[in-house]
């Protein structure tokens, strides 16, 4: 049996998202969180990552039962697995992490450029949504409804690792995260390319059903509590609301995004 795995020590990071600092004078990163490595755990995130030809792997830890299941799922593995006890993975994660006997260390996926988005794309843009559970759930919905990408800001976005990857349940391998320095500038660029920029807010000026949807389309979602920032809102062609008949009129942002994606898919 291999010796217990010891992860790299994180460098001091202050309040930087992702927990890693950049060297002095280095250019801003091109991925959310500026991470040096991604940690994935759980069956779905690990299986989908191992199937992704664009991933570069560093280390795979697996319990005996999990390794058997992994080989049944995908056959030959692209990285050699190290057999460990469940407790060894437990020590690497928070107590509430459900790892199912799998822990994968790999390189972060590259972030594509805005210019690479197709001319008929439906994409999401997240305005400083920082909760990794929400962003992961949004990625999962984006994969389910065929969104081409999710645009996030380099700062004020969770790193594409750990909790986010677990919440995405493998969707991180199918929907690229496009990391931009300034969301407003990105929306201006997309507008020049002909994208319909549709913001969402519970107090939106128009009901979603009244908007003439077309492609290319970028749907802009704001953080819970803060909503869309002023410049973001001003750059949207419409700010729509979801009509809900019940006593609670405000939805979790990941739920609202799923509903918006479903509505857009039905009106193609």
Language-model-derived ranges and their functions:
Residues 1-113:
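N-terminal positively charged helical leader segments and presequences
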Residues 198-252:
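Active-site/ligand-binding-proximal alpha/beta "capping" segment
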Residues 96-107, 171-172, 214-222:
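Short basic, glycine-rich beta-strand/loop surfaces that mediate nucleic-acid
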Residues 47, 52, 143-144, 163-171, ...:
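Structured adenosyl-cofactor binding patch, chiefly the S-adenosyl-L-methionine
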Residues 133-137, 228, 253:
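Short glycine/serine/threonine-rich phosphate/pyrophosphate-binding segments
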Residues 62, 119-206:
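RNA substrate-binding interface of SAM-dependent RNA methyltransferases
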Residues 65, 86-89, 155-156, 224-226, ...:
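Short, acidic/turn-prone active-site loops that include or flank metal/cofactor-
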């Amino acid at each position: 049996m291999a010796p217990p795995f010891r992860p790299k020590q994180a460098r001091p990071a202050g309040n930087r998202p992702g927990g890693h600092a950049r060297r002095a004078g280095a250019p801003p990163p091109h991925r959310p969180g500026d991470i040096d490595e991604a940690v994935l755990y759980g069956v779905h995130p690990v299986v989908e990552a191992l199937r992704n030809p664009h991933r570069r792997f560093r280390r795979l830890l697996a319990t005996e039962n999990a390794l058997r299941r992994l080989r049944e799922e995908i056959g030959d593995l692209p990285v050699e697995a190290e057999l460990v006890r469940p407790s060894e993975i437990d020590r690497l994660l928070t107590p509430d992490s459900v790892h199912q006997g799998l822990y994968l260390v790999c390189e972060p996926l590259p972030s594509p450029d805005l210019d690479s988005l197709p001319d008929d794309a439906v994409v999401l843009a997240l305005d400083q949504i920082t909760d990794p559970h929400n962003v992961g759930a949004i990625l999962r919905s984006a994969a389910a409804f065929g969104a081409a990408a999710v645009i996030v800001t380099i700062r004020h976005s969770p790193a594409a690792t750990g909790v986010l990857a677990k919440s995405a349940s493998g969707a991180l391998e199918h929907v690229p995260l496009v990391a931009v320095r300034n969301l407003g500038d990105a929306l201006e660029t997309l507008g020049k390319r002909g994208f319909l920029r549709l913001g969402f807010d519970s107090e939106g000026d128009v009901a979603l059903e009244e908007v003439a949807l077309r492609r290319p389309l970028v749907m802009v979602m704001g953080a819970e509590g803060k909503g869309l920032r002023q410049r973001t809102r001003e750059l949207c062609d419409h700010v729509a609301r979801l009509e809900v008949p019940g006593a609670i009129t405000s939805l979790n942002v990941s739920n609202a995004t799923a509903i918006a994606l479903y509505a857009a898919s039905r009106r193609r």
